[in-house]
């Protein structure tokens, strides 16, 4: 009996200390709004992001996950990305914190910089308290080129399936369950205009980890680094 009373008294003291210090309140607030920041994703702090020597695009505008069936075949993925779950998914150019309504739920666009070569969508969704399985992610990068560059290729990797567009034209896609591999898919030759180019991606995940990476390659497959990535309002 004395042991039980001592245990209850100890718990009471711990709760009192947590409440008085604000720690319990902070933990509760965090769990109700999300799970804390994603380990490899940060809010942009500069007006432009330049690729490193490896050429990967590290600034993206990502929409919170849209629920889907999570089927990864070519026909299923193409059907998912061409369904207008919100207005003009293949032409919209949103700003950070813009929202769309999908099946009665409000989803938000988030500007993110990745500290790695890839964008970890599992971390992105988990940190926001959003689903990570049977979902579709939309991502947009505004890529600025100081010159017109011909015969370049968009090289991508994704987990799992993905479809990619450059300046409104579909250029590459990956299907079925897969891990992200650098340059797993390489587009046909295309032209980057001088000035602004819009790269758009749709990534479908059935379950587990999910991420993507992308970069532009010169004809000799050397990464292009004299680009900048900005947001729509920059």
Model region roles, listed by residue range:
Residues 139-151, 189-194:
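Extracellular and analogous surface-interaction loops
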Residues 127-137, 176-180:
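Extracellular beta-rich ligand/substrate-recognition surface
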Residues 150-165, 199:
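Aromatic-lined ligand-binding clefts that engage carbohydrates, nucleic acids, or primary amines
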Residues 145, 154-158, 203-205:
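Non-cytosolic beta-sheet module surface loops
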Residues 30-123, 201-234:
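Accessory carbohydrate-binding/adhesion or oligomerization-edge regions at the termini
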Residues 1-9:
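N-terminal secretory signal peptides that target proteins for export/translocation
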Residues 165-215:
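Beta-strand-rich ligand-recognition modules
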Residues 11-25:
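Bacterial N-terminal signal peptides
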């Amino acid at each position: 009996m004395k042991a039980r009373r001592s245990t209850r008294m100890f718990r009471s003291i711990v709760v009192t200390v947590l409440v008085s210090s604000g720690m319990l309140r902070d933990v509760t607030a965090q769990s109700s709004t999300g799970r804390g920041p994603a380990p490899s994703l940060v809010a942009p702090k500069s007006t432009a992001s330049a690729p490193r020597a490896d050429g990967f695009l590290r600034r993206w505008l990502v929409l919170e996950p849209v629920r889907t069936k999570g089927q990864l075949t070519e026909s299923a993925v193409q059907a998912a990305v061409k369904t207008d779950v919100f207005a003009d998914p293949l032409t919209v150019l949103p700003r950070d914190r813009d929202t769309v309504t999908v099946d009665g739920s409000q989803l938000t666009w988030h500007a993110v910089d990745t500290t790695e070569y890839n964008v970890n969508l599992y971390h992105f969704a988990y940190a926001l308290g959003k689903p990570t399985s049977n979902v579709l992610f939309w991502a947009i990068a505004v890529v600025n080129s100081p010159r017109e560059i011909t015969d370049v290729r968009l090289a991508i990797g994704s987990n799992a399936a993905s479809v990619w567009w450059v300046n409104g034209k579909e250029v590459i896609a990956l299907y079925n369950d897969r891990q992200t591999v650098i340059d797993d898919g390489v587009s046909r030759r295309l032209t980057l205009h001088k000035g602004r180019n819009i790269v758009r991606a749709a990534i479908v995940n059935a379950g587990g980890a999910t991420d993507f990476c992308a970069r532009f390659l010169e004809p000799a497959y050397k990464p292009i680094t004299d680009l900048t990535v900005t947001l729509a309002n920059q």
